[in-house]
UniProtKB/Swiss-Prot annotation:
Modified residues (N-acetylmethionine): 1
Keyword Acetylation: yes
Name of this protein: Vacuolar protein sorting-associated protein 35C
Biological process according to GO: protein transport; retrograde transport, endosome to Golgi
Subunit structure comment from the entry: Component of the retromer complex which consists of VPS29 (MAG1), VPS26 (VPS26A or VPS26B), VPS35 (VPS35A or VPS35B or VPS35C), VPS5/17 (SNX1 or SNX2A or SNX2B). Component of a retromer subcomplex consisting of VPS29 (MAG1), VPS26 (VPS26A or VPS26B), VPS35 (VPS35A or VPS35B or VPS35C).
Family: Belongs to the VPS35 family.
GO cellular component: cytosol; endosome membrane; Golgi apparatus; intracellular membrane-bounded organelle; membrane; multivesicular body; retromer complex; retromer, cargo-selective complex
Length: 790
């Protein structure tokens, strides 16, 4: 049908309607019944057209409908002037064409019912039967819509003045049901009108007319006297019979939604099995998830708004019925996409969380049902289905705001197994973030194990390899999240905390070479924190076999840090070994501390080859070793000798010098008298000075090269001498400092060194200390004659 032709035909029809309406109104004004009927019939004849599209036909119908209101008033006035309503009812039946005749019958019929000269039931039955004469889908649909409209306020019901006998309200019910059935049949038949190439267009036009049919259900829901019993035994079965038998996707989807929306919540709850029983019988193409989601949403709101209704949900076993029905729907629709089936279970889960929030067994049952459905699909590659799974898994998390509650759901991890790698990781991030968002306290090692198992997509790769294309910044953020989680795990019970650390270690070490450098450090420091707590309590409070002993935890850390040396992270491993060695020192575990130093030295020798990294590592070794008090003389000498040996073998001479003079601290500890070897301190400093001399000689040999670096080394050495002088080292003499000072003065005269600010600062410090009267510091500095610096 061409749109321009449609407009022309509509314009012509409207013009004819206006013309006949004008003459009808003139006849009405002159009380000319015969002409009024004549022109009204001619006006109504325009509705016999088959040329208009449903949309245009509706426009024409509304024009006619407005004019029929005037005619109905005229009929009422005629009966008031003595005209017999029965004769009038017979008179209009002489109209020449069936369609105008039936419109006139409906109009006079509504007046007839109001007159009470005959029972409403008889008129309604007569009209609904006579309308069968029009079987053209479009014309018949609008005719019956008009019948429903003009009789809507005239249906007999309990307590109304049109009630009649005791069964009148049942007759009204039968009238509406019958009219609904016939209208739906006509509506469904519209899909077959016209060529098959225009089917999509017809379906769109049909969809625009759906409310004409649906209004009947609204009328049914408003009828007085339709209680739960009548709804259960008569109304719902009749409606569902029509819905199922029409076998039309559009009608089934719309009418099921109408049923859910227009009838009371309690009716749905008490007839749940009947309503749900129809769902598997619907056409496979029906969007069943929309239907069921609407039903569950209404029931959820009903439960939320009425506390008294909650026992009814348990009484009718609403959850079991919904769960069973969804299973049947999924089973009946073999081609149902995975996303659609997951969506169905998502709606059921939301309903369960809303109505039965205290029933974790119900929640877990829904998860289990979803697992059963997904078992036939394997890993989900469909993005839409994966997003639905994430929403499905997020629903209980959002409801309970507690990951520990989620860990009680045995089917939760089984659902996660069906996610692809990226989506599984995204879900793992949601779970871990929930711990921080809700400040969730995880109290046992079993809970930690379950949580880390759920979040394994974040902590390791499914196929054992990591995606090279992953964004480095995103990866760092993800592993920082894991590190934060490890740091958050804390409970007061040391024994259980020890079990947690062992559990975390099991998951962390499986993370792969790229993750370990980011996730092992927080594990190590968490364990060291526990060791400090144990050190503060009674010795071995849990017995020798307990897991919460410093020695056992340090043994675990030794094995853990060793993993880092296997994944090309020797610098980090060395740092952690030294941290563990210090913890062993604090716990007075000499053998364990020595083992950590041995491993650190081995890493230094075999794995750390970069010169800058060696300098940094050696400073850490010296600094840590200086604080160790647990070693006997032999072990300490062995470790100290190795450290000084490493210092002398550094690549750059300035680095050698600095490392050697730092080793002097290994022979002097303020708080331990047996660790004050002044002679060896001075030997280290003199050895460092010899290295500085070599640096100076090389600088002098290179013409045009500044000797800033070598002079600075001398000044640094001078400051070290001053440090040990203040600490009371008797081997540091004024002559030693004098000779070094003269050397500095001599070198600065040869060339502009750039070290003058450093020298001047040192001189000011010496002068300041000489003037101090308290503490005896001035006596120590009297050994230094200031004229050497003039």
């Amino acid at each position: 049908m061409i749109a321009d032709d449609d407009e022309k035909w509509l314009a012509a029809a409207i013009a004819a309607v206006k013309q006949n309406a004008f003459y009808m109104q003139r006849a009405i004004d002159s009380n000319n019944l015969k002409d009024a009927l004549k022109f009204s019939a001619q006006m109504l004849s325009e509705l016999r057209t088959s040329k208009l599209s449903p949309h245009k036909y509706y426009e024409l119908y509304m024009r006619v409908f407005n004019e029929l209101g005037t005619l109905e008033i005229f009929f009422k006035e005629e009966t008031g002037r003595g005209c017999s309503i029965a004769e009038l009812y017979e008179l209009v039946q002489h109209a020449g064409n069936i369609l105008p005749r039936l419109y006139l019958l409906c109009t006079i019929g509504s007046v007839y019912i109001k007159s009470k000269d005959v029972t409403a039931t008889d008129i309604l039955k007569d009209l609904v039967e006579m309308c069968r004469a029009v079987q053209h889908p479009l014309r018949g649909l609008f005719l019956r819509s008009y019948l429903a409209q003009v009789t809507r306020d005239k249906l007999p019901s309990i307590g109304s003045d049109l009630e009649g006998d005791g069964d009148a309200h049942m007759n009204a019910l039968e009238f509406v049901l019958q009219n609904f059935t016939e209208m739906n049949k006509l509506w469904v038949r519209m899909q077959h009108q016209g060529p098959s190439r225009e089917k999509e267009k017809r379906e769109k036009e049909r969809n625009e007319l759906r409310d004409l049919v649906g209004k009947n259900l609204h009328v049914l829901s408003q009828l007085e006297g339709v209680d739960l019993g009548i709804y259960r035994d008569t109304v719902l079965p009749r409606i569902l019979e029509q819905v199922v038998n029409c076998k039309d996707e559009l009608a089934q989807c719309y009418l099921m939604d109408c049923i859910i929306q227009v009838f009371p919540d309690d009716f749905h709850l008490q007839t749940l099995d009947v309503l749900l029983g129809a769902c598997p019988q619907l056409q496979p193409s029906v969007d069943i998830k929309t239907v069921l989601s609407g039903l569950m949403e209404r029931l959820s709101n009903y439960a939320a708004s009425s506390v008294e209704a909650l026992p009814n949900f348990l009484q009718v076993e609403a959850f079991s019925k919904l769960n069973y029905a969804i299973g049947k729907v999924v089973e009946a629709q073999a081609d149902l996409p995975a996303a659609a089936s997951v969506t169905l279970y998502l709606f059921l889960l939301k309903f369960t969380l809303h109505v039965y929030s205290d029933r974790l067994d119900y929640v877990d049952q829904v998860l289990g049902s979803c697992v059963t459905q997904l078992s036939a699909t394997g890993k989900l590659c469909d993005d839409k289905a994966a997003k639905q799974i994430v929403a499905f898994l997020s629903a209980p998390l959002e409801k309970y705001n507690n990951v520990v509650t989620i860990l009680k759901l045995t089917n939760y991890p089984l659902v996660m197994e069906y996610l692809d790698r990226e989506t599984n990781k995204a879900m793992a991030i949601i779970l871990v973030q929930s711990v921080f968002k809700n400040n969730t306290h995880i109290a046992t090692a079993d809970e930690v194990d379950a949580l880390f198992e759920l979040a394994k997509g974040l902590m390791k790769d499914f196929d054992g390899t990591i995606d090279d294309e992953i964004d480095e910044e995103d990866f760092q953020e993800e592993q920082n999240l894991v590190a934060r989680l490890v740091n958050k795990l804390y409970i007061d019970d040391p024994e259980e905390m020890s079990k947690i650390i062992f559990t975390v270690r099991k998951h962390i070490v499986a993370g792969g070479p790229k993750r370990l450098p980011l996730t092992i450090p927080p594990l190590v420091f968490s364990a060291l924190k526990l060791i400090r707590r144990l050190r503060g309590g009674d010795e071995n409070p849990f017995g020798d076999d307990a897991s919460a002993t410093p020695k056992r935890i340090l043994q675990l850390l030794s094995e853990t840090v060793e993993v880092l040396s296997d994944v090309s992270a020797p610098d980090l491993a060395l740092r952690l070994y030294l941290q563990c060695a210090q913890a062993a020192n604090n716990c007075e575990l000499e053998t364990v501390a020595y083992e950590f130093f041995t491993k650190a030295y081995l890493l230094y020798e075999e794995e750390i080859s970069d010169s800058k990294a060696q300098v940094t590592a050696l400073r850490l070794i010296i600094g840590t070793l200086q604080r160790m008090r647990v070693f006997n003389v032999e072990n300490r000498d062995t470790l100290t000798h190795k450290a000084t040996g490493y210092s002398a073998r550094l690549l750059r001479k300035p680095d050698q010098c600095r490392a050697v003079y730092e080793c002097a601290h290994l022979f002097w500890a303020d708080e331990c008298e047996n660790l004050k070897d002044g002679e060896r301190v001075v030997l280290c400093l003199k050895r460092a000075q010899r290295i500085a001399d070599a640096v100076q000689q090389m600088a002098n040999a290179s013409r045009g090269t500044s000797s800033t670096g070598s002079v600075s080394l001398y000044v640094e050495l001078l400051n070290k001498y001053l440090y040990f002088l203040e600490k009371g080292n008797q081997q540091v003499t004024g002559d030693t400092i004098k000779s070094l000072a003269e050397l500095i003065k001599s070198e600065t005269k040869k060339v502009e060194s750039g070290a003058e600010p450093f020298i001047n600062s040192t001189l000011r410090y010496i002068e300041f200390q000489r003037q101090q009267e308290d503490g005896g510091m001035n006596e120590k500095y009297e050994k230094i004659k200031m004229e050497w610096f003039e």
